[in-house]
């Protein structure tokens, strides 16, 4: 088994930047919890019936890929596990080997690190096919290394398989909620619709870069194509298309990963398919080729066991602690998925950047709320002032003139004073306005009628003016 990518900080950073922190944590926690490599899981042979069924669903439609997740009970302690069974993905129009960039080289290196970490090889991989790798290709090829335990993962293919109900997500938040640990890859590819349909021995997953409204006829078509007993039967000793699959042995089991253009673009455009030897000798993943490694097929019964004492209770407590930590991480990741769905303009996909973007977004929203509240109060004041304009009466006399201003009480500056006086049964019988150098002095002559003292009335007037 090759070196795990998370054992080297540079490799881990490279992988995390390409597939996302959630997927990186998922791979690490999966390897730590079960210690089950992909080489132990059942890898179905490249059967034409299954491949033709997947191709039939994708070609001539708006779906961009189709995956078959095979339900396999490899280890009774792990329960049912959904692993890659087969797949088909179309190539975008115009994708060619000439459009090659440094990012494509990084993607290939990440795929190689994943292959070495979960399949393993002591020999060098050599690149036999160059060219551009789109984000759709990267999502499709990286999915080869994912597996989903049905007893712990209640989302994605495992959630569909356990519930037995199809799932159709036709918006970005719902798609990200389904993909979860693959959400970084899905967002990069730009998926708008995902369909997950449970069948007899697994789950068929379809994804599209377009928005596709829910159509029950599509679900029925998938069930009719993949729901028959002539397809995969996954049991303790799985058989695929009537062929006995052995978890041991040295025969290579090839998986065809085909990329084909859309039907309407077939004329004058062809691209060779990629053979993926997922598990076994002469492994080749998207142009990477490795030597034979017969030890990958050892089952639990064939592996040499170390002699020694039985594990103490402390070992079980440690395993329980690992499981609790895994569940805690999963719940935390769920919160991040929900946060990512509601925060716009995410700068980066890592958790630290997501939290920083969320804080910035919330702060901006609080500022906008304060501005809106202030504008609302100003508008109310303007509306109240525009209800009834003040009336001006001008009278000319022999030696002088009299100017009389009248306006509604609620719009007058001393309206609060008058209202407070009325509430305390104090009626002003005379008032006078005097102009000084510093302002205006409004004098009221009062005639107390209630039991309110002068000091109490003063406090109430000050309180009303301070509001």
Curated annotation (Swiss-Prot):
<comment type="subunit">
    <text>Homodimer.</text>
</comment>
<dbReference type="GO" id="GO:0003677">
    <property type="term" value="F:DNA binding"/>
</dbReference>
<dbReference type="Pfam" id="PF00010">
    <property type="entry name" value="HLH"/>
</dbReference>
<keyword id="KW-0804">Transcription</keyword>
<dbReference type="GO" id="GO:0010629">
    <property type="term" value="P:negative regulation of gene expression"/>
</dbReference>
<dbReference type="InterPro" id="IPR045084">
    <property type="entry name" value="AIB/MYC-like"/>
</dbReference>
<keyword id="KW-0539">Nucleus</keyword>
<dbReference type="GO" id="GO:0003700">
    <property type="term" value="F:DNA-binding transcription factor activity"/>
</dbReference>
<feature type="domain" description="bHLH">
    <location>
        <begin position="316"/>
        <end position="365"/>
    </location>
</feature>
<dbReference type="InterPro" id="IPR011598">
    <property type="entry name" value="bHLH_dom"/>
</dbReference>
<keyword id="KW-0805">Transcription regulation</keyword>
<protein>
    <recommendedName>
        <fullName>Transcription factor bHLH3</fullName>
    </recommendedName>
</protein>
<dbReference type="GO" id="GO:0006355">
    <property type="term" value="P:regulation of DNA-templated transcription"/>
</dbReference>
<dbReference type="GO" id="GO:0046983">
    <property type="term" value="F:protein dimerization activity"/>
</dbReference>
<dbReference type="Pfam" id="PF14215">
    <property type="entry name" value="bHLH-MYC_N"/>
</dbReference>
<dbReference type="InterPro" id="IPR025610">
    <property type="entry name" value="MYC/MYB_N"/>
</dbReference>
<dbReference type="InterPro" id="IPR036638">
    <property type="entry name" value="HLH_DNA-bd_sf"/>
</dbReference>
<dbReference type="GO" id="GO:0005634">
    <property type="term" value="C:nucleus"/>
</dbReference>
<keyword id="KW-0238">DNA-binding</keyword>
